[in-house]
Each structure stands twice: as C-alpha cells, then as structure tokens.
Amino acid sequence: MKSSEIRQAFLNYFVQRGHQIVASSSLVPSNDPTLLFTNAGMVQFKDLFLGLETRSYQRAATAQRCVRAGGKHNDLENVGYTARHHTFFEMLGNFSFGDYFKREAIQYAWEFLTEVLHIPAERLWVTVYKEDLEAEDIWLKEMKVSPERFSRCGEKDNFWSMGDTGPCGPCTEIFYDHGPEVAGGPPGSPDEDGDRYIEIWNLVFMQFNRDREGHLHPLPKPSVDTGMGLERLAAVIQGVHSNYEIDSFQYLIKAIAQLGQDIDLNHTSLKVIADHIRSCSFLIVDGVLPSNEGRGYVLRRIIRRAVRHGNKLGLPSPFFSKLVQPLIDVMGDAYPELINSKAHIERILQQEENQFTRTLEQGLRLLQDHIKNLQGQELSGEVAFKLYDTYGFPIDLTADIIREQGLHIDMEAFNQLMQQQREQSQAASQFTTDYHAVSQLDHQSEFHGYEKESMEAKIIGLLQEGNEVKSINKGAKGAVILDHTPFYAESGGQVGDKGLLIGKEFTFQVDDTQKVGQAVVHYGKVIKGELTLDLLIHAQVDNIRRDAIRLNHTATHLLHAALKKIVGQHVQQRGSLVDAERARFDFSHFEALTPQQIQQIEEVVNAQIRANNEVITQVMDIESAKQSGAVALFGEKYSDAVRVLSMGDFSKELCGGTHARRTGDIGLFKIVAEYGIASGIRRIEMVTGRYALAWVNEQLGFMNNLAATLKTTPNSLQEKVSQLLLDNKNQEKMIAKLLSEKAQKSGADILGEIEEIKGINLLIKQLEGMDSQTMRHTMDQLKSRIDSAVIILFTIEQNKMNVIAGVSKNIIGKAPSAAQLVRHLCGKGGGRDDMAQGGGGVPEDLNSKIKEIKEMIEKI
C-alpha cells in the first residue's frame, strides 16, 4: 500500500463517519504569531478549541503538512541520522469540536488500524494516562485489548496541555511493536527508549480547563484532537523499519542518486537531501523565501544543509532544484499547488544554491584547516562564528560537519559572539510576542459600515488610559465603544476611519478606529461638552476620507491581479497599508521589477479602471469561496463566512474592507515607487484618483522647472541631459589624462631617490600638494617602472597624513605586505598585499617609523 493510498484511505474512512475534510493549512500559521511553523494538525483549529471561533461542522479530518525546524520543535540536526526525524512530515488527524468524545475516538482509531489497514491487534500496544479510568475501561472492556499489551503512564507522556493555563486533558497513544528482534521495551518501562515500540497515533481528549492555580475544571464541550504521522504509518504498512525506506522517500532517494555516480543508496546524505527537498519546496509554496531572519532564515539553513550534503556526495551543482519534479511525481496529486509553483520553487532553490556554492568551498577549506590543527575535540566558538558571519554557514551546518569527525563546538563562546552581534544590530526575534497578553473587552459592537457612513448609536463603553470610565470631559483624550457603528476598524491593511460622534451637547472627534475583542473602539478627543455612558449619539464617518480609502483599497486588488499576470503566479501579497492619500502593497518576489514591468502593470490596472466594472461583494463560506477561485491572502485568518470581492473576471479576492462601487471610480492609478524591504519581499507605493493627478502634475512641474534651469524645453530634456553627461565624461577623460601626465612627471622626478637594500628597491617619499587619485596614478607609474619594489608615498596637510604603499608581486611573502607598511607608518589603513592605503594623524616619531621600515627590509 503506497503512502498516497494510506492518506486517501484515512480521509475516506472519516468522510464515511460524518467528518468534514479540511484542506491542509499553510505552513505559516495565520492564527498564532508565537508559532514559527505549523507543526501539528490542530494548529489551524486552535481558536475552535479555545472557544474563540465557530464553524459549520463539528467533525473534521485532515492531512496536514508540518515542519519542525527552528524554535521549540527543531529536528534539523537529527534529520538523516535517525530513522524517524524529519523537517517535513504529514500528520493525519481527526477532530471533534464538542461532538463525539473518548469512546468514538478510540473506536475509530482501532477500527481503522485493524480493519481498514489490517494491522494485527497483537502488534499494537496501548497507553493511557494513569488517572484516566474512563479511557482504560473503553480499551480493556469494550475494545477487548489484552491487558498484557496495555500500560498506564504519567503526566509527562500522557497528559497534554496548550500552555500553563487553558484547555488540557489526558491522551491515549497507540504504538506498533516491531518484534523482539528489535531492542527496546514497552512504553512506560525502563527500556522504552529503544526502537521496538514506535508511537503511531496520539489521541488527545481535551476535557479540562486549567486555571492559574493549576486547578482543573471540566469543559462544557470536551473535544478530541488526534495526530498520526503518515511516514511512520507507511513504514509499518510497508514492513520497513525506517521512514526513509517507504515508497515516497525511496523514489526521491533514487532520483538524487541518479544525479551522481556510484552512490550507495543507504548513504546518510541521500536521506538528508530527500527530506530537505520536501520542506524547502512546501515552505516556498506557502510564501516563505530565503532570508537572514525569521522563517526565511530557517529555510535558508535547510537549503544550505542540503547543498552541503550534495557537495559531500559529489553532485554537480546546481542539483537541488532538479529534485522538484521527482517530488511532484510522488506528492503532486495530493498537493497540486506544488505543480502550479514548480518554476517558482526551482528558480528560488537554484538562486540560493548558486549563492551559497560560491562560499561553500572556501568555508570548508577554512574549517578543515582548523580541524587539522585542533589540539583536542572542541572547535573554537570564534571559528564557528567566522564560518557563520563570513561564509554563511548556519551553526547547525558546522555542527553537522564536525560531528561526523567526532568533534563538537564551543557553543558558549559562539553564543557570546552571537549575543554581541545581536546587541550591536539591536536585532530581536519577531516570534516572542505574547499572543495571549492582549486584554479582552466584554463589549460587543455591530458594524454597519459597508452600507452606511452615518447612523444613530448608543455609548456602551468609555475608556481612558486603558481603564473603563463613566465619563470623559472636554479636552480629554479617550476611547468610545458604541453598540452600533459605521466606523471601519483597522484591519487587513486598511486604516481605521476618522470622523465625529455628535450629541446635543457634546462632540467627540474620532482620530482612529480599532477592533479589540468583539468591540469597535473609537479613539480620539472630546472637543465639546462631556461624554457619559448610555448617551445617544450620531456617528458620522469622514466620508471624503473614506471615499479616498475605498479607491486605494480597490486599486490594491487590481494591482495584485496585475502582478500575478505580469510578474508571475508565485506573487503573494505579504502586507499592505491603505490610507486616503496613498497605498503601499508588499508582495513576494525575488528581484526588482524592471521599468518595462512597472509600465505594463500600470497599463493593465488603468485598462481595468477604464472598463468600469462593477465591484461585486458576495458573502459565502470559506470553502465555497476558495473553490470559486477567490484568492485567499497569505497569512490572513478567515472565519467560516467570508466576503468575496469580484471585479469582472479580472480579480476575485477574499476581503473585509470597504471598496469603490465600480472600478471607474478610481479614475487614475500610478506607481510612484518600487523597492525591496526584505529578502524576497518587494514594496510598491501607489496613488489613485485626485492624488494620482496631483502627483502627475507635481512631476510635470518638476520637469518644466528642470527644463527651464537647463535652458531647454520639456520635450528636449532627455537630449539635453544626455549631452551634458557626454560633455562631463569628456571632461573626466581630460582630467584623467592630465593626472596621468602629472603622475608620470612626479614618478620620473623621484626615481633617483630609490634605495636598494638586499635586492629590494625601497622608495619612501613625501609628496607636496598631491590628491589621493594622483598619488595612486603615481604609484602605478612607479610600480610599472621599478622591479622588486617596496614603495611608500605620503602627503601631510593640516596635520593629517595620507599614505599609499605598493609592493611588487614577485617579492610578496618576502617583504612586508603593503597593508602592514601602511599600518606601521600611520596606524590605520588596509588593503591587499601588493597595494594598500591609510591615513590619520601624523605620528610624532614619523622619522623613527621610516627608519624602522628600512630596518625591516634589511632583516630580510
């Protein structure tokens, strides 16, 4: 039975038992900024378990793509060296959200394993939490599991919690017994760490809520969260002991081996590369690009580890991108997004491999040189840091290499150097946010801003400095919560509305609107009278500002579609800011847009504006929206019911913002800037409507003023500037010629001052009134005319010294280097062995230093 068949059998089994099949969520979690990657099936359902979200179904089943590399769950260093560690794996899971509980969950698991997959019951072993008598009775009395293949375990192994507080509960685990020929004892025994008993399915029963004192309280609706690794299960079904021996891995391993010559199919490096092409490809599919921070750096580490193992196998570079097609062969049917992103994945992997290959050989030589000279078994932290900082070797890659030679790194010294670098750059992790620290308000507001810009409402909450109050006086700043509001709260990149809250005897100026919990919070200042609770008010949005925001937001949708059309389908929105005056749009792409691409994008968007398509909004469930072809934005969290925004057949996206009624309302679209903001992330700044017209007029005014300054017409401006540049170039050539002539004359004048010492022609000369460029020309002239030369030229002006030194290449290694000579004379400077420059204050003992240089030459 193939891995793909096992996956489908699992999903089919649970469909037949009333479960909703939910597609694998992105590897980048949308609902938990504390989590680096999706590492379990339950991640996309976290808010359901916490009671923060409801969906149309109470039973679900998934085949979830997971990554464990970086952060708390980091398997990277073990991948390839053990039978079951992976950076990427698939987790099969079934879930109940207040529907069925322990009995059905246990029955489903046992039936699927023994009756669908036909695993002999006598090869399975079951564990429960020692205090979970209910689960124990179900297993022993109802499922008739033999007490001899059953054990009770403690809280460490069989009790699960989401954190120190919150939902938690006991779990029951099912293990597969590989037989007595494999070392290891049953779970819970002193010998449990062996490989005989392998966990294949974990069933978590969330039935308690743990408070701050550690007390457990029963949940009103207990839930079930189960997880089973597909790779482990496939190994059991296919009768192999290592996950790397299953069909999908063997296909990849053989494809890798074919890229080289006479490679042993059991080579560890093949396993490493086979694992890493899976994680790297799917991370790129989900919008992660190699970078030097966050998720992008984890991806870079994995790619570089794979490239290093390819180098170890002697695979011709670039090789890594050639494995995308074999991966599609084994996983493309289940994950068609791999097929759609094939060219994009290959391009990113090849680009990253080419970049790293340039420094890999140098870094490996440096590392091997240090290993040869090691006195003990520990590589210094300084060397490891240099490999990291200069040659791009992630620390786990260096550790991987030296572990193969029985060595280890002085991690304390390495970490100290890393800390120094962090302090200097003031870099901080973006994943340390306390997601659960945001206070939740009990108030609820109903939003009417899609259809209204003004309405009557009642004040249900007042806040000052984060505290709820009963009144806010004139001149004071504060926040107002209404029962109903037309004000849009900042979300999805669109800024919050501004406007006024007006009563008979008061006025509150709204400067910003935010969503806190279920409440819409209006921040601002009382400009008339006094606000108190329960007052009736008239809420009026600044409709001129709102209209400008609408135009910009609708334009970002047209821009997104145009980018996909012109640049490529790999483009994903990675952020936006939609304000009244302009908008910015961040997107994933690996290089700057060309002027031609920017022009094409503007033409496409403005054509859609002229088409004057109606902007249609439909509310539907999330699955129907995705099936209709609507684009779901990267990293965005959606509820079950979503708003789908369509503009003809050109753009269809999920969006909760406010928009123009027709594309023609935008009037004009203009890109004013395009630049990179991070590795693999570009930003476009744009203007629309009257702001676009104002920008165009401003540019025309600038062009007219420039033309007047240059005494030409706007139409002749390019020709005039080209002529000025040509004239400037000719002047530079003339200056260079004069400098060369001056240098030749200066060089000829001082040739007679050469002093020969032990076959080396030494010339140390102070020059008067000569700039750095002429000094370099003079040095070049002298070096071309003097063999075996050590030449030092310097100038002194206003007690500042400028020095240049040159050494003939035939005596490099024999004579002091040019950089050494410069530093000896003036203390500062650097360069190559044959040419160096420096400068600084004039040393008091200048003559002594010149004498010391002569003595250095005499000692050769």
Swiss-Prot record:
Keywords: Aminoacyl-tRNA synthetase, ATP-binding, Cytoplasm, Ligase, Metal-binding, Nucleotide-binding, Protein biosynthesis, RNA-binding, tRNA-binding, Zinc
Molecular function terms, GO-annotated: alanine-tRNA ligase activity; aminoacyl-tRNA deacylase activity; ATP binding; tRNA binding; zinc ion binding
Positions of Zn(2+) binding: H553, H557, C655, H659
Classification via InterPro entries: aa-tRNA-synth_II/BPL/LPL, Ala-tRNA-lgiase_IIc, Ala-tRNA-ligase_IIc_anticod-bd, Ala-tRNA-synth_IIc_core, Ala-tRNA-synth_IIc_N, Ala-tRNA_ligase, Ala_tRNA_ligase_euk/bac, DHHA1_dom
This protein's record includes keyword Lyase: no
Enzyme class name: ligase
Principal place of residence: cytoplasm
Compartments where located: Cytoplasm
Cofactor binding comment, as recorded: Binds 1 zinc ion per subunit.
A GO cellular-component term linked to this record: cytosol
Enzymatic reactions: tRNA(Ala) + L-alanine + ATP = L-alanyl-tRNA(Ala) + AMP + diphosphate
Cofactor: Zn(2+)
Domain remark from Swiss-Prot or TrEMBL: Consists of three domains; the N-terminal catalytic domain, the editing domain and the C-terminal C-Ala domain. The editing domain removes incorrectly charged amino acids, while the C-Ala domain, along with tRNA(Ala), serves as a bridge to cooperatively bring together the editing and aminoacylation centers thus stimulating deacylation of misacylated tRNAs.
Classification via PANTHER family: ALANINE--TRNA LIGASE, CYTOPLASMIC (PTHR11777:SF9), ALANYL-TRNA SYNTHETASE (PTHR11777)
UniProt name for this protein: Alanine--tRNA ligase
Source organism per UniProt: Legionella pneumophila subsp. pneumophila (strain Philadelphia 1 / ATCC 33152 / DSM 7513)
